[in-house]
Amino acid sequence: LISTEDRYLLDTNVVSETRKRRPDLRVGVFLEALRADQMFVSVMTLGELRKGAETRARNDREAAEELSRWLERMKEAFAARVIPVDGEVADRWGRLSATRTRPVIDTLLAATAIVHDLTLVTRNTRDVADTGARLLNPWEQ
């Protein structure tokens, strides 16, 4: 388990912000202050990004291919810092999900952050605020 201080699990909305033509300055400042070894992503984030590329391919093949190339570079950059959904994360997700209905992926990310002692960096804090996960919303910094 990852248990070092100052380590962050980046939600899809944070990672995606870096691709925008005009990313939010607060998100950029937050990410630029971190070292690479402080940033982690879940396999679920990679899945959401792949879904985005495949969905875009229906309307804009060129943009989808560019997004796919970016995703491959990101996967290489994060290679040792991609966290799977393992048995312990799944168990924590089940416990969190039993307390009330929550978005599945957001709750899996909260469970991952709890199990690996990471701070979940997300814009979607409302749905997981009562999970016990440490949360940080860079849009509110």
PLM region spans:
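Short, well-structured N-terminal submotif of metal-dependent ribonuclease cores
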Residues: 1-45, 55-73, 141
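Phosphate-coordinating loops and pocket residues in cytosolic domains that bind phosphorylated ligands
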Residues: 20, 51, 130
